[in-house]
């Protein structure tokens, strides 16, 4: 399955691929081989990049799911106005080779959305959390409030978020993507029992990163 969030970019890439293939037919020999290789390479890269595999979402209602594929880059205690004092930040680094579609970590209602333009520092630079372009999303339900942020990086400079304030969302459902990877930060309340540690691999919509008490 291919992600609908990158449909425009995917179509453009495939059209360029066809143009390269057509140009290759005009020139004989090595030039033709170069154009043909570039055409196939671009098409395969576009299909690989915008892949959107199905996921088996855990049925546990108090489970907080990973919102992104990648690896846990950072875990630390912070204070956040939406989640309160002694909240826990979990940062997930998404490489260009990960699936880039983001998923909702917990069932609830979207109570807050805030887009901030900014820099494009490397995603593994922790200053990127505050300084980089990002979309901050606040979710609440009867148990808790959580906040998660799509953070653009040095390569990833396009954030896609389909959410609106007031939307009711299901855990594990798709809500957007960050093109070419980067990072996704999630802040959970103090009462959350984490089940991941730094370096753990995460799969969006499947990996349980913690349980809300």
UniProtKB/Swiss-Prot annotation:
Tagged with keyword Lipid metabolism: yes
Family of this protein: Belongs to the phosphatidylserine decarboxylase family. PSD-A subfamily.
Membrane topology: Peripheral membrane protein
Subunit structure: Heterodimer of a large membrane-associated beta subunit and a small pyruvoyl-containing alpha subunit.
GO biological process: phosphatidylethanolamine biosynthetic process
Pathway: Phospholipid metabolism; phosphatidylethanolamine biosynthesis; phosphatidylethanolamine from CDP-diacylglycerol: step 2/2
GO cellular component, one term: plasma membrane
PTM text: Is synthesized initially as an inactive proenzyme. Formation of the active enzyme involves a self-maturation process in which the active site pyruvoyl group is generated from an internal serine residue via an autocatalytic post-translational modification. Two non-identical subunits are generated from the proenzyme in this reaction, and the pyruvate is formed at the N-terminus of the alpha chain, which is derived from the carboxyl end of the proenzyme.
Name this polypeptide is given: Phosphatidylserine decarboxylase proenzyme
Major localisation: membrane
Catalytic activity field: a 1,2-diacyl-sn-glycero-3-phospho-L-serine + H(+) = a 1,2-diacyl-sn-glycero-3-phosphoethanolamine + CO2
